[in-house]
Amino acid sequence: MDSRERVLVALAGERPDRVPFALGFFSQPLYGSPDADELFSSDVRFVEFDPPVEHAGLLDYLESLPDDVHVGSPAQLRTYGEWGYHPETEAEHALAYAGSPDDVVEGLLPDLTDPRRHTGLTEDVRALHLRRLAVAGAPPSLGGELFESAYRLRGFARFMEDLLERQPLVDYVLDRLTAMLVRNVTVLAEAGVDVLLLDDDVASSHGLIISPDTWRRFFRPRLGQVIGAAREAAPEMRIFYHSDGDFTRLVPELAALGVDVVNPVAPDCMDALAIRRKHGPRPALWGTVGDASLWDRGTPEQVREEVAHRIATLGPAGLLLAPSYDLDYAPRENVEAFVEAVLEFG
């Protein structure tokens, strides 16, 4: 099998010739390379929307920073400014003042319909397919989440109050965000990506941030709308869902909505083996390997042992191995051990 076939088979819950791997779920610079997945020849490459034209200079600044300076995902930082979200300065949130839908002034939310945001996207996907690589694509940050985008626009504490006291406003904001997301996932589907990356951190290490009933009331139907639009545009595309923390309680409901693969299933938050025993190889698992201490302070042999254990207990069907945490501070020899172990044991 080539990489594209391998990933598509694994994410369908079937058995590939070996377990595929990636270095995360977005393109990230490591060890002087702009793309860790290219550097280590993983099975997946990632495409993304271009930054807004008026903010494109930020990318030049980010790329000029030393390798040991980490300021977050460039894909996130490029879009924060236009949404009025400035966590580094704790500036007021764009919709902090709103008490009802009538208070949301037209034009405060960014226009995501500019075709310049996805110029060349189809060509990028086609070029990667010619290399027989699987291609994953995510909507732009803030334009690609529901829960996270809403609380960043309102402020976290204020949005928690909204869910109880200002539900018409919540519905209005989430409907606007859902419309943006539907358009963005349709663009990605029509560009030909193999895996649609949906990302919404609804959990902490101790469980869901909001109750399951609140998630079902506000977020499940809208997520279903997004997935439905993606399926209509590209029926064979795999649907990926990421949340930090422990979202075990949502796994069966995500699968019922059409999610094919969940991520990162971090071992210090979720029990991947219990999920596998309960649900089988669908949804597939993307991630599962190591907590932050393993990657940052563990030895290459410990990484190898973790990979071998994951393959033996979770694989080979329905599994794509990846670090369950960012690799910003991981020694290169640990990442090399991960790749070598996947190829040896997978």
What is the predicted function of each stretch?
Residues 1-346:
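Catalytic cores of TIM-barrel enzymes
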